[in-house]
Amino acid sequence: MTYLFENYKRAPIEFVKAEGSYLIDSEGKAYLDFSSGIGVTNLGFQPQVQQALIQQAGRIWHSPNLYLSSLQEQVAQELAGSYDYLAFFCNSGAEANEAAIKLARKATGKQGIITFQQSFHGRTFGAMAATGQDKIKEGFGDGVPHFSYAVYND
């Protein structure tokens, strides 16, 4: 019996520890981490990242975009480099995709967006609409309209 909603079919493995790019299961077996926490820990499990997180947690965990953040500004500047770019920070890939959908539609005035068959963009309504897999969308009714799906290498 589980009290967890099964939004994914879970593999019968429990990871209890991580070292570098490896995950260690409850039996002590090491696995090369190809999932990266599905985006949330894509820097691996490095001691320097752990120390930076501990140091930041001692200061402040979160400050919304309603307020200034010198660290956020510094990272945005590093990302932009010498280009005239702006950064938009998100909590997840689905949120980034939702923002990209909105930005593309607002900037162009067009509604249509093309993604690829067999793609995966997230589980929010806009991200599911962008996803080129019917099985991801089944049971949720009409999604966000105006998506087309191209075939890879066609």
Provide a role label for each language-model segment.
Residues 14-16, 80-82, 106-107, 138-143:
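Solvent-exposed alpha-helices and their adjacent loops that cap or buttress functional pockets
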Residues 2-3, 30-110, 114:
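Glycine-rich loop-to-alpha-helix module at the N-terminal edge of alpha/beta enzyme cores
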Residues 119-154:
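PLP-dependent aminotransferase-class I/II
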Residues 24-25, 43-44, 130:
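Short beta-strand-to-turn element immediately C-terminal to the catalytic PLP-Schiff-base lysine
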Residues 1-19, 59:
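Active-site-adjacent loop/helix segments that line or gate small-molecule/cofactor pockets in enzymes
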Residues 13-33:
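Active-site and channel-lining beta-strand-loop segments
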Residues 8-10, 76, 99-101, 133-136:
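A generic local structural motif
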